[in-house]
C-alpha cells in the first residue's frame, strides 16, 4: 500500500526537514483539497500527522482531521501526540482507520497493550522514529537509548504488528530510504509489517523497497516537489 503523506501544522499542510519545526515549508493551505487530489488519482490511503499534536501531546488540528475523514473515503492512518487511551478512542470514534502511537509506546507501553487488547492490532500502529537506530521521542525533540530492534520486539510481544519506521536523518531530505535498516527489521521480525517512512526521492526508491520485501510505503516531499507523481504511485500501489 502506498500512503501519500499530509503533515498538519496550524491547520495547513506542511513539510519539515528532518523533523525540524524551524525548517517548515507550506505545501498546501487547504489540506482537504490536497487529500481530494490524492483520492481523485485513484489512491486509497493517507498518512496523516498532526505536527502540533506531536509537540503538544494532545489533538490540535482536530477540525481539519474531522473534515478529511468526513469528506473523503480514504483509509486514514493518523499520528502525532497520541499519548492516552482517550485520544485513541476519540480518533477511532470519528472514523480514523488506524492510529499511530509514537513516544508513548516507549514511555507507556501499557497504553499500547491496552489499546491493542481493546481495538485490535489492525487499529494500532507503533511509530519507531530515530537517529542511528536509537528511538527519538516527544515529536523527535528528545533522544533515547532504546534501539529500534528493542522497541519492535517489545511491541510485538503485546500484539502490535504494524510499525511505521522513520530514519529521521532521511526524513524530508530526498536522500533515499534506509532500505538496509527497513529490510533488516522486516527479515528479523517476520511477524511484523514494517512501514517505510522518510527519504523517498523517486519512484525507483518505491519499487526497490517493494522488491526488498517492504510493501507499505509513505511518500511525502518527493510527491510535493514533483519528483514522484500521483499517477506513478497509483501504478505501483499494490
Curated annotation (Swiss-Prot):
Does the keyword Cytoplasm belong to this entry? yes
- Quote the pathway field: Amino-acid biosynthesis; L-histidine biosynthesis; L-histidine from 5-phospho-alpha-D-ribose 1-diphosphate: step 4/9
Q: Among the entry's GO cellular component annotations, what is one?
A: cytoplasm
Q: What is its EC number?
A: 5.3.1.16
Which coarse location class applies to the principal site listed for this UniProt protein? cytoplasm
What UniProt keywords apply to this chain's record, in alphabetical order?
Amino-acid biosynthesis, Cytoplasm, Histidine biosynthesis, Isomerase
Q: Which GO terms describe its biological process?
A: L-histidine biosynthetic process; L-tryptophan biosynthetic process
**Localization terms from the record:** Cytoplasm
Q: Where is the active site?
A: 7 (proton acceptor), 129 (proton donor)
Query: Which InterPro entries does this entry report, sorted A to Z?
Result: Aldolase_TIM, His_biosynth, HisA_bact_arch, Isoase_HisA-like, Isoase_HisA-like_bact, RibuloseP-bd_barrel
Q: Its family?
A: Belongs to the HisA/HisF family.
Output this protein's name. Answer: 1-(5-phosphoribosyl)-5-[(5-phosphoribosylamino)methylideneamino] imidazole-4-carboxamide isomerase
Source species, please? Leuconostoc mesenteroides subsp. mesenteroides (strain ATCC 8293 / DSM 20343 / BCRC 11652 / CCM 1803 / JCM 6124 / NCDO 523 / NBRC 100496 / NCIMB 8023 / NCTC 12954 / NRRL B-1118 / 37Y)
Which lineage do the record's taxonomy fields give for this organism? Bacteria, Bacillati, Bacillota, Bacilli, Lactobacillales
